């Protein structure tokens, strides 16, 4: 499929261009009903354009038509919380056509957080799917002037009935979609950081292709990331438009929270396949799937697997590579977008390259052979982090990298700045890397390593079901069962940083380590639950009380502390 011409790079214009020049080309695959086994249908660009027009007319009907003299000036915000379905994609496009901008908030945000977003965005109305209207009740408790409107289901807009076209004659210019509020993706940001990069990658030499766009080109990819996330909408709308990905939308009623390994295998069974297929998963899910034959068989239907949200342990990545699956990291930040990592060597999935001098990214020395990825402000920079902070000249991503010995220009991911534990001895190590080694054991469901400002680090272990303590096994026996995995991790630590049995703490029944929506660990929240048990382990091991919390925050009068010597 040909590139969208530059003057049609505004998203609604790009959809209309595709609908005119490639009407029967499939944009996305949508579910027929609430279950995976109910089947799917193809949504063409012609059908997409018609659905966007239908929703645009609906928005004008319920919100009022913005006068032509005022349209495309202030871009009033339309907040939406809903079921994880195609309405998110349609709302982005229809809001733009009607002179508005859609704002998506994660449904799990606190009422206080949602109220703050409404205040910052100066929202006058809220939208929601039927099953999510209640989420707005508390944030709007003292805002009677703001009403909530229910957005009808996808089939109200995606249908075979005729729809009058909704005119959209905007062409690309140097303006943005309005004053940045919470997180604004401007038209120029989409143009320069998605559209232009996709075209650049498509026509680049083989060794200079962007990983995201090279892999996604012409590939069917199940949409497993929440559409209220920046990455979710990016992979369901912008990347398909400019890189020809075909997102496979899943029936939201069937998606467990969090997704399970059985659900991922069911996608492999029921979701329609194309000539090229890929999948984007969090590392924790990949670890579960590669441990079982059915999981490996399901994953092998994909040409490539991308991991997001956290680093992938070497054992899991190597296992996927051995299955003939290409493994690739996709990493970025909502404030600045995707990092344009180049497509890696299939056999060298652990190491990465960056394009030279693209978007002012550079690696800045952090410590001990580690470098932090940074990006400097460019003239008239459209990235949100710079547009919203005029005084900021450099954005530090907090993502750390290590140069690969003997491979100039190649880097391995070394976690994040806040992934590192610094002991009282000033010995520093990557806790995430150690956790990945321990979690490779089938005896361990999840673990957390910490110990900032202590003489010794500790490990909190959530044993796998059947290992304990869910079968009333004493902690001491559980520790013996998981110890081989911890001992293997110790081989990668300096002697003073090694973990000990006496500072191995086992989680309690009904109180697992807390996960985020990305299946990564909520470190502080988990440690707060087990603060007393961990402090008791330090005391039993003979360590004196210290003026720091177990997550490393100073307490009391640090200047008068008499140390934490054994």
How would you name each of these model-derived features?
Residues 172, 242-245, 276-280, 290-353, ...:
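Gly/Ser/Thr-rich phosphate-binding loop
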Residues 194-220, 224-277:
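Conserved AMP-binding/adenylation subdomain of ANL enzymes
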Residues 14-47, 62-72, 171, 504-511:
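AMP-dependent adenylate-forming
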Residues 421, 446-448, 455, 483-563:
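Conserved C-terminal "lid"/linker of ANL adenylate-forming enzymes
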Residues 42-45, 167-204:
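Conserved AMP-binding A3 loop
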Residues 38-44, 58-109, 223-227:
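Conserved AMP-binding/adenylate-forming
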Residues 90-93, 97-166, 272-276, 282:
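Structural core segment of the AMP-binding/adenylate-forming
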Residues 390-502, 512, 566:
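AMP-binding/adenylate-forming catalytic core of the ANL superfamily
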């Amino acid at each position: 499929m040909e590139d969208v011409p530059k003057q049609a790079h505004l998203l609604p214009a790009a959809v209309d261009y595709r609908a005119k020049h490639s009407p029967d080309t499939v944009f996305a695959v949508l579910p027929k009903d609430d279950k995976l086994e109910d089947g799917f249908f193809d949504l063409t660009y012609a059908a997409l354009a018609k659905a966007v027009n239908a929703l645009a007319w609906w928005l004008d009907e319920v919100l009022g038509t913005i006068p032509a003299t005022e349209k495309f000036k202030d871009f009033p915000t339309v907040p939406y919380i809903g079921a994880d379905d195609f309405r998110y994609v349609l709302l982005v496009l229809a809001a733009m056509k009607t002179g508005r901008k859609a704002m998506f908030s994660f449904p799990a945000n606190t009422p206080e957080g949602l109220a703050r977003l409404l205040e910052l965005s100066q929202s006058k109305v809220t939208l929601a799917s039927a099953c999510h209207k209640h989420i707005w009740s508390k944030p709007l408790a003292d805002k009677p002037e703001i009403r909530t409107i229910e957005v009808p289901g996808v089939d109200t807009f995606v249908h075979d009935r005729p729809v009058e076209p909704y005119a959209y004659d905007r062409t690309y210019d140097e303006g943005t979609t309005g004053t940045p509020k919470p997180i604004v993706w401007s038209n120029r940001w989409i143009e320069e950081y998605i559209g232009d990069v996709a075209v650049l990658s498509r026509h680049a030499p083989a060794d200079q292709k962007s990983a995201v766009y090279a892999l996604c080109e012409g590939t069917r990819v199940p949409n497993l990331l929440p559409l209220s996330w920046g990455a979710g909408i990016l992979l369901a709308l912008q990347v398909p438009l400019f890189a020809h990905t075909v997102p496979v939308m899943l029936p939201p009623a069937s998606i467990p929270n969090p997704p399970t390994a059985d659900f991922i295998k069911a996608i492999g069974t029921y979701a329609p396949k194309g000539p090229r297929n890929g999948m984007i998963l969090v590392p924790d899910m990949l670890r579960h799937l590669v441990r079982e034959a059915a999981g490996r068989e399901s994953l092998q239907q994909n040409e490539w697997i991308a991991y997001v949200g956290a680093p992938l342990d070497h054992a899991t990545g190597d296992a996927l590579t051995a299955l003939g699956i290409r493994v690739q990291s996709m990493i970025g930040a909502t404030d600045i977008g995707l990092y344009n990592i180049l497509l890696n060597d299939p056999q060298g999935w652990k190491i990465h390259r960056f394009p030279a001098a693209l978007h002012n990214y550079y690696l800045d020395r952090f410590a001990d052979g580690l470098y932090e990825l940074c990006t400097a402000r460019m003239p008239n920079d459209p990235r949100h982090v710079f547009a919203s902070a005029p005084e900021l000249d450099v954005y530090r991503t907090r993502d750390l990298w290590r140069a690969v010995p003997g491979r100039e220009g190649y880097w391995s991911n070394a976690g994040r700045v806040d992934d590192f534990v610094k002991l009282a001895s000033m010995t520093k190590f990557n806790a995430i890397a150690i956790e990945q080694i321990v979690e490779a054991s089938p005896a361990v469901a999840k673990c957390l390593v910490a110990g900032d400002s202590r003489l010794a680090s500790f490990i909190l272990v959530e044993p796998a079901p059947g290992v304990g303590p869910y079968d009333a096994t004493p902690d001491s026996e559980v520790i013996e069962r998981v110890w081989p995995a911890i001992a293997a991790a110790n081989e990668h630590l300096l002697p003073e940083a090694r973990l000990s049995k006496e500072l191995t703490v086992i989680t309690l029944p009904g109180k697992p380590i807390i996960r985020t929506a990305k299946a990564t660990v909520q470190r502080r929240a988990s440690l707060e639950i087990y603060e007393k048990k961990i402090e008791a382990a330090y005391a039993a091991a003979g360590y004196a009380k210290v003026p720091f919390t177990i997550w490393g925050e100073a307490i009391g009068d640090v200047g008068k502390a008499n140390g934490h010597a054994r």
